[in-house]
């Protein structure tokens, strides 16, 4: 994320692809819900070091970015905290804005086979999705759907043996189904 886009979002506020979090006390405990939500939806940005005030969002900064990053990576790579290590080194950066450090975490959308991305070792209570500016806990049915989608190989990527041309397709397809 470039500086101009970041400053514009600070003026506009949060939405479906950006979440601001204060990091005054270190890594926020609720960051993992947001990582899960972005990974299970369309991806997004988590900006650490931006606080809410009565007048809107303000850049408060991150005091010790290296310690915060160490804590982030230790938890990110712990399967008891986060089911899938979704971010890579290039997804995390420290940016100086107004003489203060911000940590920008780009959370990519998880592949279908990686979902659900969940926290605390429990897919039924630890799977989140993003809806406008909030993270919400997925229902058991949503989680089961993600698990089904992850396990099933779509029919359109399977190679059907014995088909030499599309002209043969209808007859051979019907015959292959009849023999199953």
Regions found by a protein language model. Name each.
Residues 1-180:
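Conserved N-terminal catalytic/coupling substructures associated with nucleotide/phosphate chemistry
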């Amino acid at each position: 994320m470039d500086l101009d886009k970041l400053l514009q979002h600070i003026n506009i506020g949060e939405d479906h692809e950006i979440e601001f979090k204060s990091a005054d006390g270190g890594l926020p405990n609720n960051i993992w819900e947001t990582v899960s939500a972005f990974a299970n939806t369309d991806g997004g940005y988590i900006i650490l070091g931006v606080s809410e005030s009565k007048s809107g969002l303000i850049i408060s900064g991150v005091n010790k970015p290296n310690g915060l990053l160490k804590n982030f990576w230790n938890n990110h790579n712990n399967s008891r905290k986060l089911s899938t290590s979704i971010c890579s080194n290039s997804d995390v950066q420290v940016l100086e804005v107004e003489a203060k450090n911000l940590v920008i975490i780009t959370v990519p959308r998880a592949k279908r086979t990686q979902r659900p991305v969940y926290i605390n070792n429990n897919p039924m209570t630890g799977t989140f999705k993003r809806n406008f500016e909030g993270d919400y806990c997925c229902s058991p049915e949503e989680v089961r759907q993600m698990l089904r989608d992850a396990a099933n190989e779509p029919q359109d990527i399977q190679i059907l043996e014995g088909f030499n041309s599309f002209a043969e397709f209808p007859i051979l397809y019907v015959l292959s189904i009849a023999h199953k």
